[in-house]
């Protein structure tokens, strides 16, 4: 049950009973009403702006409307009190019985508590990582991988039909460079002295096994071929090897995609899919022949002072028109982007989410223009830009590159601190804000280390169940047993913990709808703090302890509360791609 959705319905039903509303029903818009937690929890459990947004169309002032609504709200048996604050905000105090029933519902739903149908099966494509297949994942890829993967998990939990996608950039000039770099390692594997790696090729040792694999499979055959013969063979082998490496790196972060889409497929059949996309835009009136003025600053590779086939993107929100086909008939990189979006649209996605690095900020408007033109407004495009991650150790900056010139890899970071700290901390700032990652801090066993603090809360929940078995040998209450005992949960501290848990369904929906997965990390930290705080009170006040060895039934009821906390923590950590340990080791 979503307490805020529930009281949204109750408040609207109460409004419908007012004569003033009945007489002016066509003038009021209930969709503007919000129901949320009050900023000051001492004011109540639920707050609404109903009187503030409806007073003007009803020809009255907010406070007068609020006072008029109070008796109708007080008639609700689950409302213990109503007060009007300031100019007309309404705060409601929820009854103990309501919290108890809500707790029973949480216990019954288990880890599915918070699951939503708000997405109604709407198909969403989330594309993230999409690193060039030219080497291992470096630490700069971590943030986009975690943001995209967690957002996709949230959207699925909120009822959307989600596809996690990786776009393989395997058609650009960098792939030729990769193939020539691998061929050099192939020659090395055959026993040649290749000397130092020439400038412009990839120097990393990660290509040595790829060259050796080619030598094992082909012997000296490739060496005897002209470049136009061996290049496509080596390209295929190199891309396959790089994608195996990338998949393994991502698996270390618990990141797995449903679809790996190859850019090369867009160029098959002389670029048939790209031409089809251009023809589609032409049919819709978005393509013309012309020349583009030189852009300010450094000229891009695809600019030329000749007539080209252009996308009239300024008419759909872009800053300038974009070239689709050069004067020689070859396609631009942007044309492939258009074809890729059309492919997604043709697959039936109503929203496409691109998770990109901050250096792609200049692409946002052109991608949005493509979405408007191709889908004719039927499909939404959202771009999330991830700012840089800076590495620290004990507060001191860590160089992002090694002595060899290679970047610190994703594997380096996960091997040192573990998967869960990386996943959690990559979400502990909004994606649009820079993030500092301190190797020392994320391995601390303290409140200052969010992932430890949250996982420790789950482990502590499980330890309470073990303590219960020590106090009451053989005690293993079922969910039904615990739910049946919730009437014994009445202490204000316990009810405040239930109220914190009750925020979870709203949190899931808001984080999914706003595309802000960091909200989940913040919520879990707050929930862990509430739980640890209540546990600590039990050290000084025996009557607040979760296990009362003289009262079996009360202990079972409180185990139900602990169970609900554990389930929400496990649910949230799972969505984050992290473990919920039963014990901290």
Curated annotation (Swiss-Prot):
The superkingdom of the source organism is Bacteria
Which GO molecular function entries does the Swiss-Prot or TrEMBL record give?
Answer: arginine-tRNA ligase activity; ATP binding
Enzyme Commission number(s)? 6.1.1.19
Q: Where in the cell is it found?
A: Cytoplasm
One GO term of the biological process aspect: arginyl-tRNA aminoacylation
**Motif position, 'HIGH' region:** 131-141
Record field: catalytic activity: tRNA(Arg) + L-arginine + ATP = L-arginyl-tRNA(Arg) + AMP + diphosphate
Keyword Transmembrane helix found:
no
Into which EC class is this enzyme placed?
ligase
| Keyword terms, alphabetized | Aminoacyl-tRNA synthetase, ATP-binding, Cytoplasm, Ligase, Nucleotide-binding, Protein biosynthesis
Q: What is its main location?
A: cytoplasm
GO terms for cellular component: cytoplasm
The text of the family note is: Belongs to the class-I aminoacyl-tRNA synthetase family.
Listed NCBIfam families:
argS
Record's PANTHER family? ARGININE--TRNA LIGASE, CYTOPLASMIC, ARGINYL-TRNA SYNTHETASE
How this chain assembles, per its entry, is: Monomer.
Name the record gives this protein: Arginine--tRNA ligase
Q: What is the lineage of its organism?
A: Bacteria, Pseudomonadati, Pseudomonadota, Alphaproteobacteria, Hyphomicrobiales
């Amino acid at each position: 049950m979503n307490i805020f959705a529930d009281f949204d319905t109750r408040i609207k039903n109460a409004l419908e009973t007012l004569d003033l509303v009945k007489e002016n029903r066509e003038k009021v818009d209930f969709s503007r009403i919000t129901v949320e937690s009050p900023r000051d929890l001492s004011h109540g459990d639920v707050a609404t702006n109903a009187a503030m947004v409806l007073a003007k169309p009803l020809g009255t002032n907010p406070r007068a409307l609020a006072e008029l609504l109070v008796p109708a709200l007080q008639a609700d048996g689950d409302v213990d009190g109503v007060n009007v604050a300031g100019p007309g905000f309404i705060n409601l105090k929820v009854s103990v019985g309501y919290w108890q029933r809500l707790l029973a519902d949480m216990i019954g739903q288990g880890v599915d508590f918070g699951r939503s149908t708000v997405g109604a099966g709407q198909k969403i494509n989330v594309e993230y990582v999409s690193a060039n297949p030219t080497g291992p994942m470096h630490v700069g890829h971590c943030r986009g991988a975690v943001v995209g993967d967690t957002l996709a998990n949230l959207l699925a939990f909120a009822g959307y039909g989600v596809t996690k996608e990786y776009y393989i950039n395997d058609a650009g000039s960098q792939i030729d460079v990769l193939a020539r770099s691998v061929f050099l390692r192939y020659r090395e594997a055959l026993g040649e002295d290749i000397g130092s790696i020439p400038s412009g090729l990839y120097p990393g040792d990660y290509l040595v096994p790829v060259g050796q694999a080619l030598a094992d499979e082909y012997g000296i055959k490739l060496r005897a071929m002209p470049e136009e013969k061996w290049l496509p063979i080596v390209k295929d082998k190199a891309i396959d090897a790089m994608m195996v490496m990338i998949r393994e790196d991502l698996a270390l972060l618990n990141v797995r995609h449903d679809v790996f889409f190859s850019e090369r497929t867009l160029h098959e059949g002389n670029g048939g899919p790209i031409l089809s996309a251009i023809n589609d835009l032409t049919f819709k009136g978005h393509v013309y022949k012309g020349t583009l003025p030189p852009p300010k600053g450094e000229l891009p590779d695809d600019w030329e002072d000749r007539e080209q086939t252009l996308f009239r993107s300024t008419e759909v929100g872009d800053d300038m028109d974009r070239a689709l086909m050069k004067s020689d008939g070859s396609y631009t990189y942007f044309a492939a982007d258009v074809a890729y979006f059309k492919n997604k649209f043709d697959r039936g996605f109503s929203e496409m989410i691109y998770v990109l690095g901050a250096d792609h900020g200049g692409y946002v408007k052109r991608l949005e223009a493509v979405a408007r033109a191709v889908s004719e407004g039927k499909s939404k495009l959202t771009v999330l830009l991830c700012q840089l991650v800076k590495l620290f150790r004990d507060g001191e900056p860590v160089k992002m590159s090694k002595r060899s010139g290679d970047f610190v890899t994703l594997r380096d970071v996960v091997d040192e601190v573990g998967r869960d700290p990386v996943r959690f901390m990559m979400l502990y700032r909004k994606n649009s804000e820079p993030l500092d990652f301190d190797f020392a801090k994320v391995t601390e066993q303290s409140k200052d280390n969010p992932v430890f603090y949250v996982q420790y809360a789950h482990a502590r929940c499980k330890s309470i169940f073990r303590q219960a078995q020590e106090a009451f040998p053989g005690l293993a209450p079922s969910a039904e047993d615990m739910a049946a005992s919730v009437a014994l949960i009445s202490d204000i501290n316990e009810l405040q913990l239930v109220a914190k848990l009750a925020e979870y369904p709203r949190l899931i929906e808001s984080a999914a709808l706003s595309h802000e997965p960091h909200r989940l990390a913040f919520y879990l930290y707050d929930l862990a703090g509430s739980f640890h705080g209540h546990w600590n009170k039990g050290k000084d006040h025996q009557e607040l302890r979760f296990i009362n060895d003289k009262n079996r039934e009360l202990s079972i009821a409180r185990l139900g509360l602990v169970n609900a906390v554990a389930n929400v923590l496990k649910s949230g950590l799972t969505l984050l791609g992290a473990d919920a340990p039963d014990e901290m080791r």
